[in-house]
Amino acid sequence: MRQVRVEALLLPMVIACLLGICLCSDNALAPFQPEITSATDNFQLQATGVKNRTATLNYAWDNTGTRATVNHSTTTTSGTARVIIKDAGGAQVYDRALVPSLGDTTTTGAPGTWTIRLELDRYSGTLNFRVQKL
């Protein structure tokens, strides 16, 4: 049986994080002092001056309704930022890149705890979006 040193497995992850491209951390926005509110029927995220971030961030949000509005107010200088929302049953109800100004709605989903996923790919700019029960 071949043994693999733990250090050898961790090295690529450490290098990626040092380069500012954390692929796995929910703290990827921490250096930019994000303001994140996840209250029943109201979710909001804002982070200013984000620079070259690649990450997937997941947030739980309680929606007592079956639909939601999604308001975009994001400024992108490079890269992409995408929001994907899944309902309490795991069905995808929304998937769109964040843009400077947009009022949008999700499709109908099951009430309960929804998942809001923010996918950043080499993103730089100011993130700002809100999701509210419709």
What kind of region is each of these model predictions?
Residues 1-26:
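Sec-dependent bacterial lipoprotein signal peptides
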Residues 26-62:
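Transition segment at domain starts
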Residues 55-76:
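Short, surface-exposed binding/anchoring microloops in extracellular/periplasmic proteins
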Residues 59, 102-108:
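Exposed aromatic-hydrophobic patches
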Residues 66-72, 106-124:
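Noncatalytic modules at the cell exterior or secretory-pathway interfaces
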Residues 78-95, 132:
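Short, surface-exposed beta-strand/strand-loop-strand elements in extracellular ectodomains
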Residues 81, 119-134:
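Edge beta-strands of jelly-roll/beta-sandwich modules across compartments, strongly enriched
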